[in-house]
Amino acid sequence: MKIDVLTLFPDMFTGVFGSSILKQASDKGIVSFQTVDFREYAANKHRKVDDYPYGGGAGMVLSPQPIFDAVSALTKNGKKKPRIIMLCPQGEQHSQQKAAELAKEEHLIFLCGHYEGFDERVRHLVTDELSIGDYVLTGGELAAMVIADSVVRLLPGVLGNDESAVTDSYSTGLLEHPHYTRPADFRGMKVPDVLLSGHHAKIEEWRMEQSLRRTLERRPDLLKGYEPTAKEADILKRLMDKQE
C-alpha cells in the first residue's frame, strides 16, 4: 500500500510514521509513506496557499490550485485511481468497518486542511470525507494519523499475529474482553481462575461473555445492528435479565 499525505506541516508525521507498528510495516515493505507539503505546488511567487473567502467572513480558505496540482503529480503514473480522503469535521465518522474497507486499497491520499478549510471545488477530487469525532481540530493532520494507523495495522503481515487485528474491539462488532498477564495475584487483585485453568472452551466462553458484558454496559448502541450467535444470544439474555 502507498499512503501520501498532503499537508502544510509534514514534520508532524515524522514521529508517527517512524515509530512502532507503522515503522515496522514500512520496514517490511508492506506500506510506503510520503508526506507532501502542498505549499511547494503553489503557482505564485510567495508560495501562498490561502486567500480571503468570497462573501466575507472570518479566516482564510485554502486555494484549490495547489491541491489539484499536487494530486495530479501524485497520480500521473498510477494505473488505478486512488482513494482521496479529505479530513474534515463534516465527514463520515471513521469506524473499524471503514478502516477495513480502506485496507483493501493500493493507494490512499490524505488531504489535511487548515484555517477555514479547503475551497469547495477541492471536493471534486475527493472520494471520501472522514472525521474522527464530533469536534474540531486545528488541522487534519491528527485525524490522518489516526486513520492511517487504523488502516495499516489491518494489512496482512503487519501485526505479529494477524488474529490480533481480528479480535480487537470493534472488529467483531463488540468491545474486546479484558486481558491479563503475570503475576496471577497483584496487590490482591487476582486473575480470574478460568484463565489459569487451561480449559480452552471455558476460556473462550468467558471471553465471549466478558465481551458482551462490556458492550452492553459501555456501548449498548453497538448491539443494535449486531447479529449474535445462538450462544451469544443466550448470554445476552442472561446479562440483560440481571440488569432489570
From Swiss-Prot:
SUPFAM superfamilies: alpha/beta knot. GO terms for molecular function: tRNA (guanine(37)-N1)-methyltransferase activity. Keywords: Cytoplasm, Methyltransferase, S-adenosyl-L-methionine, Transferase, tRNA processing. It is found in: Cytoplasm. GO terms for biological process: tRNA N1-guanine methylation. It catalyses: guanosine(37) in tRNA + S-adenosyl-L-methionine = N(1)-methylguanosine(37) in tRNA + S-adenosyl-L-homocysteine + H(+). InterPro entries: Alpha/beta_knot_MTases (IPR029028), tRNA_m1G_MeTrfase_C_sf (IPR023148), tRNA_m1G_MeTrfase_TrmD (IPR002649), tRNA_m1G_MTases_N (IPR029026), tRNA_MeTrfase_TRMD/TRM10 (IPR016009). Pfam families: tRNA_m1G_MT (PF01746). It is an enzyme of class 2 (transferase). S-adenosyl-L-methionine binds at residues 113, 132-137. Its EC number is 2.1.1.228. Its main location: cytoplasm. GO terms for cellular component: cytosol. Homodimer. Specifically methylates guanosine-37 in various tRNAs. This is tRNA (guanine-N(1)-)-methyltransferase.
